[in-house]
Design a protein with these regions (language model features):
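Short helix/turn-capping signatures at newly exposed starts of structured segments
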Residues: 1-109, 113-117, 126-140
Length: 140
């Protein structure tokens, strides 16, 4: 099933309760074990489910850790990214973030909250691909 969980209290992600990647500990070995390396990107070879949607996950390691969750279903926005069911589910799942977002433009939404461990969470809509991506960043 490959269900993804993203913790807001710890810099960690979990896939199906058995693959735990804690970005505060020695995580490169876990990435090597479960992800395929392509340049400086680590790609999870199987499709995941997050917020009840199919997605792919890519982790890029540089001076920052960037976790890309790329949702697979084609999405056509009527107005802004705030109206998408993915963003609405995200806000419902993490109510602590409900009042800490900024709509940068109709296609980009950022969450910043001192009560979470991640440096930045942002949703971006790519109209050409008709896809939404969640980007989670933290310092390495």
């Amino acid at each position: 099933m490959n269900n993804l969980q993203v913790s807001m209290n710890h810099k960690k992600i979990t896939i199906d309760n058995n693959i735990v990647i804690d970005f505060m500990e020695e995580f490169p070995n876990k990435l090597k074990e479960f992800f395929t390396l392509s340049g400086n990107s680590h790609v999870f070879d199987r499709e995941i489910t997050y917020l009840s949607e199919k997605a792919n996950i890519i982790i890029v390691i540089s001076h920052k850790i960037k976790i890309y969750i790329i949702f697979k279903d084609y999405i056509y926005l009527d107005n802004t990214i705030l109206n998408s069911k993915i963003v609405r589910r995200f806000i419902k799942k993490y109510p602590i973030l409900a009042s800490s977002y900024e709509l940068i433009n109709p296609m980009k939404l950022e969450f910043k909250n001192s009560n979470i461990v991640w440096d930045c969470l942002s949703f971006t809509y790519d109209a050409k691909q008709a896809a939404i991506t969640l980007l989670i960043t933290t310092l390495n």
